[in-house]
């Protein structure tokens, strides 16, 4: 009986050990949230879009993540721009955003994550502005881990590539 009680307590603690104040810095590279559950392998019910397919170095592009249906909400995210394995550029979170915050994954503001919010404040759509480094050229993809709830999450979902052009 005591064993069952201990298992129940440990399970409850695991369920509350998700990261309500944002992704841990340890998730910056692999983008795995550490929920003690396996990520979903089927395609995510979310899209990652940009209004343009190319931008000059030093310029910005809006990146939008949307659930495909109203039920496809987000409890948490970790969003980065990647060129190969490198996290590049900086993000701007809209003023007054009650869902998101910039994150330091080696450089200030080079990722976006969620912050503490009530379940009723889960989002179906979020948008952020990404600014390319002025000296960057080549393709970049926007990579996101999306958490719908503790046991339903998709890791390292990618956008179509955006070409970064020489700013000269």
From Swiss-Prot:
Description of what induces expression: By bacteria (E.coli and M.luteus).
Disulphides: 28-105
Domain of life: Eukaryota
Keywords carried by this UniProt record: Antibiotic, Antimicrobial, Disulfide bond, Immunity, Innate immunity, Secreted, Signal
Annotated function: As this protein is expressed upon bacterial infection, it may have antimicrobial activity.
GO biological process: defense response to bacterium; defense response to protozoan; innate immune response
Family: Belongs to the insect defense protein family.
Tissue and organ expression note: Very highly expressed in midgut, and highly expressed in fat body, silk gland and epidermis.
Listed name of the protein: Putative defense protein 1
InterPro entries, A to Z: Ferric-chelate_Red/DefProt, Reeler_dom, Reeler_sf
Residue span(s) of domain Reelin: 19-168
Broad class of the protein's primary localization: secreted
Coiled-coil region list: none
Listed Pfam families: Reeler
CC per GO annotation: extracellular region; membrane
Span of the signal peptide: 1-18
Localization (cell): Secreted
